[in-house]
């Protein structure tokens, strides 16, 4: 029986195919996951491309950080593997490693309401920028320019994905009030 293809909302991006590897149909991906051991031990199916074609994950090898070599069921020669170049590689969100209490998936932040701890609404998360040190959310504010808020404990009091909101403590100078004159 063929694996049902998940919707775009049900998958997480783990990488992108950058090339074929070897002659036996393995693919090389640039990974954006640090959960390689979980991928190796617990994930049985990956999905490739916009159409999210299912492939059985047979083997995962990490020759260096950020690069994975995958063996996929049905991909047995270099020509077939080369045809997958450029495809996004996803897994079902339910197959991902469980998150710790203070962790989140980036896609979960989009569209959340950002509320000041005093109760006033600041705006809605439009974009997430990954800086390496910490994530930064771009908050779209009605009638004002967007603002950037770092996702750090000093600023974020509560992140409640289920309630659709992020409650923040505004540190002095964190938001530019556009210097609007009355």
From Swiss-Prot:
Pfam families for the chain: PRC_RimM, RimM
Subcellular location: Cytoplasm
Gene Ontology process terms (BP): ribosomal small subunit biogenesis; rRNA processing
InterPro entries (UniProt xref): PRC_barrel-like_sf, PRC_RimM, RimM, RimM_N, RimM_N_sf, Transl_B-barrel_sf
Record-annotated PRC barrel domain positions: 101-174
Protein's UniProt keywords contain Cytoplasm: yes
This protein's UniProt keywords: Chaperone, Cytoplasm, Ribosome biogenesis, rRNA processing
Main location: cytoplasm
Cellular component terms per the entry's GO annotation: cytoplasm; ribosome
Molecular function via GO: ribosome binding
Quaternary context: Binds ribosomal protein uS19.
NCBIfam families: 16S_RimM (TIGR02273)
PANTHER family reported for this sequence: RIBOSOME MATURATION FACTOR RIMM
Domain notes: The PRC barrel domain binds ribosomal protein uS19.
Family the UniProt entry places it in: Belongs to the RimM family.
Role noted for this protein: An accessory protein needed during the final step in the assembly of 30S ribosomal subunit, possibly for assembly of the head region. Essential for efficient processing of 16S rRNA. May be needed both before and after RbfA during the maturation of 16S rRNA. It has affinity for free ribosomal 30S subunits but not for 70S ribosomes.
Name of the protein in its database record: Ribosome maturation factor RimM
Species assigned in the record: Roseiflexus sp. (strain RS-1)
């Amino acid at each position: 029986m063929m694996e049902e293809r998940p919707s775009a909302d049900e998958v997480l991006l783990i990488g992108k195919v950058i090339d074929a590897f070897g002659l036996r149909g393995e693919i090389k991906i640039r990974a954006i996951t640090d959960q390689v051991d979980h991928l190796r031990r617990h994930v049985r199916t990956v999905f490739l491309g916009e159409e999210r074609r299912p492939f059985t994950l047979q083997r995962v090898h990490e020759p260096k950080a950020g690069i994975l070599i995958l063996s996929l069921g049905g991909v047995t020669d270099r020509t077939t593997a080369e045809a997958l170049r450029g495809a996004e590689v996803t897994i079902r969100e339910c197959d991902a490693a469980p998150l710790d209490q203070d962790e989140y998936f980036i896609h979960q932040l989009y569209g959340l309401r950002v509320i000041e701890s005093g109760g006033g609404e600041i705006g809605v998360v439009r974009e997430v920028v990954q800086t390496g040190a910490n994530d930064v959310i771009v908050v779209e504010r009605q009638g004002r320019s967007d603002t950037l808020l770092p996702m750090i404990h000093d600023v974020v009091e509560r992140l409640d994905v289920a309630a659709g909101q992020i409650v923040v403590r505004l540190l002095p100078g964190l938001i530019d009030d556009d210097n609007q004159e009355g």
